[in-house]
Regions:
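Secretory targeting signals
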Residues: 28-90, 94, 99-105, 109-110, ...
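Loop-to-transmembrane boundary segments
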Residues: 22-31, 170-171
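Juxtamembrane helix-boundary/capping and inter-helix hinge elements in multi-pass membrane proteins
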Residues: 13-20, 85-88
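Transmembrane alpha-helical segments in integral membrane proteins
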Residues: 1-5, 75-86, 175-193
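Transmembrane helix boundary and interhelical loop/hinge segments in multi-pass membrane proteins
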Residues: 1-14, 22, 26
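Alpha-helix N-cap/helix-start motif at helix boundaries, enriched for small hydrophobics
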Residues: 20-22, 80
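Terminal transmembrane helical anchor/hairpin motif
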Residues: 99-192
Length: 193
């Protein structure tokens, strides 16, 4: 409703403070993004229980990771909405803010490669932390440990298979950092509101 003057006038004549309107709309929008995750998570729990592979720790890590990343991206989208005030400019600015640092790094590095002797890289990754999507994809990963097990085929031929013994999420704390940044962006959006 913030993109139309008539809607803004109507909503702000209601006897609700601005903070109440912001919080209500923010939480309802965030809840709508979480509904598909809840359905998918419930189906995964049912399938893992039926298969005898349910892991409560893995489920908790997955839920926290999804909540943290979703909160960051939703908060940054809300902040960009309040900066632009235009429904058509919002997606462009959102994508630009999330990938501008990496694009500039690539552009400057590829430009410098033609002028600086010995500079032979197209991407340095120095400012990668300013691009949340690229940084999380490159730094948060699953560390798996396997054990080799000797088995035999029904005809008696031996073979070696790898059995997964543990899987841990490396650099999980980065998701928490970005969730805190999302909290700061939500607070800035509230101030702009």
């Amino acid at each position: 409703y913030l993109y139309s003057a008539r809607s803004v006038g109507l909503m702000h004549t209601l006897p609700i403070r601005r903070e109440g309107l912001f919080l209500t709309n923010f939480l309802s929008g965030f809840a709508m993004t979480l509904i598909p995750y809840a359905v998918t998570g419930l189906l995964c729990v049912i399938v893992s229980l039926c298969g005898g592979a349910f892991d409560a720790r893995g489920l908790a890590v997955t839920v926290l990771a999804v909540l943290g990343e979703s909160f960051f991206y939703f908060s940054s989208a809300t902040f960009v909405c309040f900066i632009t005030g235009n429904a058509f400019a919002m997606p462009a600015l959102y994508a630009l803010l999330h990938f501008l640092a990496v694009l500039l790094d690539w552009l400057i590095s590829s430009f410098a490669q033609g002028f600086i002797f010995g500079f032979s890289t197209y991407y340095t990754g120095v400012v990668e932390w300013l691009s949340p999507t690229v940084y999380l994809v490159n730094n948060v990963r699953c560390a798996r440990q396997y054990v080799e097990v000797q088995q035999t085929f029904p005809d008696g031929t031996p073979y070696t298979s790898r059995l997964l013994t543990s899987a841990d999420l490396e650099s999980f704390w980065l998701i928490g950092v970005y969730a805190l940044v999302g909290l700061a962006l939500a607070a800035l959006a509230l101030i702009l509101y």
